[in-house]
Regions:
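Short amphipathic, positively biased membrane-proximal segments
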Residues: 1-124
Length: 124
């Protein structure tokens, strides 16, 4: 399997892990926001497909970056996932204005991105 395909598969798998654990982190953080439900417009199965596809695309982008820099791939995956989270967080207000100012929602999203980056870095 080529490194690019492996990274895409790892990204897709990491996104599925994210989605499967959402009910748990919703209880832990006290925030009911779900990326999977949002992406699927209320349909969890559709949301999983879209989220897995997004994860695969992120995996391909990760592979392109790791080919150009000489750093530990696990740290790189985590840094890229958290960087994406921080860069795009303000746009969550387009989905739900109350989320952007919620410390619980921010912590939840940070955890989700860290989990995604960890899984991607381990498997890619």
């Amino acid at each position: 399997m080529s490194p690019r395909v492996r990274a895409a598969a790892a990204g897709s798998f990491a996104a599925v892990v994210w989605g499967l654990q959402e009910p748990l982190d919703q209880r832990v953080f006290g925030c009911d926001y779900s990326d999977v439900l949002f992406l699927g417009r209320g349909h969890r199965s559709v949301g999983f497909l879209v989220h897995a596809a997004n994860g695969a695309l992120f995996g391909v982008a990760f592979d392109a970056v790791r080919r150009r820099v000489d750093v530990d791939q696990r740290g790189l995956a985590l840094a890229l996932a958290l960087g994406e989270h921080l860069a795009l967080w303000p746009f969550i207000s387009l989905v739900d204005r109350s989320l952007v100012t919620s410390p619980r929602a921010f912590a939840q999203a940070t955890y989700r991105h860290a989990l995604f980056g960890f899984v991607l870095g381990r498997l890619a």
